[in-house]
Curated annotation (Swiss-Prot):
Keywords: ATP-binding, Nucleotide-binding. GO terms for molecular function: ATP binding. It comes from Methanopyrus kandleri (strain AV19 / DSM 6324 / JCM 9639 / NBRC 100938). The keyword Ribosomal protein does not apply. This is UPF0200 protein MK0400.
Length: 196
């Protein structure tokens, strides 16, 4: 089973990934493959992602991590994929591993909340200004991440909750998915919004 976590920058994907690892689930980060390729070519990561998709198609990054995903699936039977950016990548995984084997979990937070989180987080590629933040969102949306979010089987809203509360929401969703028990979540896996 593949659990694909998607969301705009600062929504909380990283925390979901941490919880998944705590639950013993291996994680494949698509951005790591892009970073490796960028380093190999001596390019900026954002430019590398764009170039890969131009050179090899919109599902290029999914194809780059396919071996890692297969290895982790053989080892653990489940893997979290962090970093799907467009519908073509999602469809690649669904075609390769089976429609019913892929669960999409979207993490949602408002733009204002995400901007504040990114400013506090302070990673090298995080925006310093509202304008930089908006440009980054536009770039992400341009890749097609909004289309992937709209196809989510599960949506976790990460607004007005403490970090421990959000992490518990993530844990609840992960455990329900692993049990294959949508009844553990209100509304099942069909575009679920985990209650605030």
């Amino acid at each position: 089973m593949l659990i694909c976590v998607v969301g705009m920058p600062g929504a909380g994907k990283g925390e979901f990934v941490k919880v998944a690892r705590e639950e013993g689930i291996p994680v494949v980060v698509m951005g790591d493959a892009v970073r490796r390729e960028a380093e190999r070519r001596g390019m900026d990561v954002g430019e590398m992602a764009k170039r890969l998709r131009e050179e090899r198609g919109m599902d290029a990054v999914a194809r780059l991590v396919e071996e890692d995903v297969e290895r982790e699936l053989r080892r653990a039977g489940v893997v979290v994929i962090d970093g799907i950016r467009n519908p073509e990548e999602l469809e690649y995984f669904r075609d390769r591993f089976g429609e019913r084997s892929v669960i999409v979990v979207a993490i949602h937070a408002s733009p204002q909340t995400r901007f504040e989180r990114l400013r506090i987080r302070g990673r090298e590629d995080d925006p310093d200004t509202k304008r930089e933040f908006e440009e980054r969102d536009e770039r992400e949306l341009g890749f097609g991440i909004g289309d992937v979010i709209s196809r989510a089987d599960v949506m976790i809203v990460n607004e007005r909750v403490s970090l421990p509360e959000f992490r518990e929401k993530c844990r609840m969703v992960i455990r329900a998915i692993l049990r294959g028990d949508p009844d553990d979540l209100p509304g099942g896996f069909d575009h679920l919004r985990v209650p605030d």
